[in-house]
Every structure is written in structure tokens, then in C-alpha cells.
Regions:
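Gly/Gly-Pro- and Ser/Thr-rich, intrinsically disordered tail segments characteristic of DNA damage-repair
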Residues: 1-117, 142
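Basic, nucleic-acid-binding surfaces and adjacent catalytic neighborhoods in DNA/RNA-processing proteins
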Residues: 22-40, 54, 149-280
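Glycine-centered flexibility motif
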Residues: 36, 47, 57, 78, ...
């Protein structure tokens, strides 16, 4: 599932062709996504000018000139694909197509149909069921060691599991939590409330750095993620521990023969990768 860097990459790609443009046609070919499309979906969007494409957690947020907001989640396999003057017939998984006044087509393609598109008023956005209760954005200025320490207080769950809780920090997922904990030198199995102030002080900038670098690389393409312009993400080539079980982590001095290198365990049904030598 796309995490914060992948969704941010998609939002930035869409902003380049959508910001300030008018939707002249919206074609809905299959309304039964994870959540059915809202009534009069195409009608309510047609003729509206897009003011800004943004992101909240793992959701695309598209503000329109009449106060309406298009909210999107890519699910497991969803993509937003940009094309100019598209002439070929739509593919079987091309469920919604948005055409702007300068001839650009953006197609929502989702083979597994776990994604969704919804509409709500701008004033209702923060209370939308998908967004209400989300934690702070880790790349915003207010996300600090003090804030994270307060969130972790009293939490006995492993720190890896705690950081995946979207009410604690918004947008983090399996890949980037594993990478951030490695950079901070913190074992993923540690109880969240056992982290000392100095450790949290390392973790916050580690989270920021990992996310910033991943966005700069266009996200991580492991299976489905593709940028709107068709390019792949490249941060997977910079993974220190994720999906590298049995290998040596960068700069590690442990005995691979004795330690088996990077370890993989399962936490809350998800794979966790870490170096037991460098993460305590």
C-alpha cells in the first residue's frame, strides 16, 4: 500500500497538470470501488476549477473552486496516470477518467479496486470519517520529539507497531518505519514507552530524513507504485534494512555468519526488518 512518500509524489505530479485547471469532463466506467462513488460524482466535478492538489496522511486531497473536495486513496494497486490527448480505448482497470481544459487526461486505474474516491465540503474535511482522528504530519514543523514523547507515553506496544498507528503519526507505513528505526538505532520490539528522551530525539529527525529522501526519489516501487508521469520510484535502491533479510546492513560490523545479518520478524501481521547488532 502506498505510504506517505508515494502519495506525496502522486500529489506533486498531479499538481503540475491540475492546479488552476478546469475539469471539462469526468467519465466513470466502474463505480463499485472499495466504496461506491458518491451520487452525481461526474456531474458535481464537471466544470469545476481545481485550486490545489495536496495530501493528508495517505490520502490525496484535491480542493475545488466551489468548496468541494475530491478525496482519494490509492488502496493496494491504484494509480493516477497522466496522458496528453489520449486516443486509445480505456483498459479494463481504468475506472475513472478526468479530462481538463488543456487536454490532459488523468486516469484512475486500480486492478484490485481497494482504492476509493469521495467528495465532501471543505468545511467538513477534518471531520470526514477517513481523516478524523489522524495524528500529526511527520514533515510539519509541529512534529517534535516532545510531541512524539507525549504520544508514546503509556503505550506498551512495540515501537514499530505504535508508529504504524495512524492516530499517533499520520502517513507512516511498514517500509519507512523500519528504515527510520534503523537510522535511529532503536529495536522495533522495544515497548514504545520505554524509549528515552535521547532516543526519541534521534527518532524524529530519522523519520523526517527518511521521508524527505524517499519523496526526492519518487517513493519506492516494489510492485504497483508508479508516478503519474509513468516513472518508477527509486528509493527501494536505498533501503538499509527493508526487504533485505540475511544481508549486511550498511556499515555493519557484525559477524554475518553468526548473526544471519538483517533479521525479519512479523509484528501485527506485517514484516519487520532490523539489525539486532545496531538496533537496541
Amino acid at each position: 500500500m502506498p505510504e506517505l512518500p508515494e502519495v506525496e509524489t502522486v500529489a506533486r505530479g498531479l499538481a503540475q497538470v491540475w492546479d488552476g485547471r478546469t475539469l471539462v469532463r469526468v467519465e466513470c466506467r466502474r463505480p463499485d470501488l472499495r466504496k461506491p462513488l458518491p451520487p452525481r460524482f461526474a456531474e458535481r466535478l464537471t466544470g469545476r476549477r481545481i485550486e490545489r492538489v495536496g495530501r493528508r496522511a495517505k490520502y490525496l486531497v484535491v480542493g475545488l473552486d466551489d468548496g468541494l473536495v475530491l478525496l482519494g486513496h490509492l488502496g493496494m494497486s491504484g494509480r493516477m496516470v497522466i496522458s496528453q490527448g489520449r486516443n486509445e480505448p480505456p483498459g479494463r482497470h481504468d475506472h475513472v477518467e478526468f479530462i481538463t481544459d488543456h487536454g490532459i487526461s488523468v486516469t484512475y486505474c486500480d486492478p484490485r479496486r481497494f482504492g476509493l474516491l469521495d467528495l465532501c465540503g471543505r468545511d467538513e474535511l477534518s471531520a470526514h470519517p477517513l481523516l478524523a482522528g489522524l495524528g500529526p504530519e511527520p514533515l510539519e514543523a509541529g512534529f517534535s520529539a516532545e510531541m512524539l514523547a507525549a504520544c508514546l507515553a503509556g503505550r506498551r506496544s512495540p515501537i514499530k507497531v505504535a508508529l504504524l498507528d495512524q492516530t499517533l503519526v499520520a502517513g507512516l507505513g511498514n517500509i519507512y518505519v523500519s528504515e527510520s528505526l534503523f537510522r535511529a538505532g532503536i529495536a522495533p520490539t522495544r515497548p514504545a514507552d520505554s524509549l528515552k528522551a535521547a532516543e526519541i530525539g534521534r527518532l524524529v529527525p530519522a523519520i523526517r530524513d527518511v521521508l524527505t529522501e524517499a519523496i526526492a526519489a519518487g517513493g519506492s516501487t516494489l510492485r504497483d507504485h508508479v508516478r503519474p508521469d509513468g516513472e518508477l520510484g527509486y528509493f527501494q535502491h536505498s533501503f538499509a534494512v527493508y526487504d533485505r533479510a540475511g544481508e549486511a546492513c550498511p556499515g555493519c560490523t557484525c559477524d554475518i555468519a553468526g548473526s544471519s545479518g538483517i533479521q525479519r520478524i512479523v509484528q501485527a501481521g506485517r514484516s519487520t526488518f532490523f539489525c539486532a547488532h545496531r538496533q537496541r
